[in-house]
């Protein structure tokens, strides 16, 4: 009998694994709608949708392993990281989906969210003021006009699977949509700066490294408090707070 394994669980959604099947439970069916549509449109390998019965989506497990995790050791050869970069470029060059995604928030919305979050981080004593101020300055470089691309929107390292030097699939598409391509590249390399050059080689075009670093700061500032409130530890070695400290 297959065991039921909890992959991730918090108040908004949960993912369970039973054998070779992942069960995604999400009370917000709009997120599942986005995920199913994005997987059908993406020109890269994605999990097979087995069935859907709200609030549950069942997808097949992917072959291979991830390149690592935030705060954990990174695995895979430089060629594997480059292959991931090439897959990301293929996604970004695809025809645009119909709606904006997490990577497509407007500059006005981002500035408002970022300023509010920075104030809360300091007034609630979550992070020291100098750390927040410095990273808010670094984040400014991400707040610029960009050309819309087909973006994943939550392209964490743990969401990309490889077998050897081949990408076997990308999972968790609920934040996909039109957005800033460099947001995806920054999310994928967050906490693993040592592999950024390999990813860019595979991506096949020059990118603005100041904007990548800005997204590292911006994304980390926006998620620290949420992570704490939902039972995760952004203060763990190599995680979001260490990313912020690296910008000092």
Q: Positions of the model-derived regions?
A:
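Conserved protein kinase catalytic core
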Residues: 30, 66, 160, 178, ...
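Alpha-helix C-terminal capping segments
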Residues: 1, 14-19, 38-43, 49, ...
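Active-site acidic catalytic loop and adjacent metal/ATP-binding pocket
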Residues: 12-17, 23, 49, 136-185
């Amino acid at each position: 009998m297959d065991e039921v394994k909890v992959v991730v669980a918090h108040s908004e959604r949960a993912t369970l694994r039973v054998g070779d099947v992942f069960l995604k439970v999400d009370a917000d069916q709009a997120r599942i709608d986005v995920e199913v549509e994005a997987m059908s449109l993406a020109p890269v390998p994605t999990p097979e949708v087995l069935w859907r019965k709200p609030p549950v989506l069942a997808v097949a497990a992917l072959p291979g392993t991830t390149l690592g995790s935030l705060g954990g050791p990174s695995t895979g050869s430089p060629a594997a990281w480059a292959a991931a970069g090439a897959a990301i470029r293929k996604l970004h060059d695809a025809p645009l989906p119909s709606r904006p995604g997490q990577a497509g928030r407007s500059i006005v919305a981002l500035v408002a969210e970022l300023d509010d979050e920075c104030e809360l981080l300091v007034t609630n004593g979550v992070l020291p003021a100098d750390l927040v101020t410095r990273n808010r300055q670094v984040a400014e470089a991400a707040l610029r006009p960009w050309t819309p691309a087909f973006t994943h929107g939550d392209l964490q390292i743990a969401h990309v699977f490889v077998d050897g030097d081949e990408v076997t699939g990308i999972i968790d598409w609920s934040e996909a949509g039109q957005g800033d391509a460099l947001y995806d590249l920054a999310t994928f390399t967050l906490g693993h700066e040592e592999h950024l050059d390999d990813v860019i080689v595979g991506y096949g075009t020059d990118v603005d490294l100041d904007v990548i670093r800005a997204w590292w700061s911006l994304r980390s500032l926006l998620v620290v408090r949420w992570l704490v409130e939902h039972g995760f530890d952004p203060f763990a070695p190599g995680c979001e707070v260490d990313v912020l400290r690296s910008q000092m």
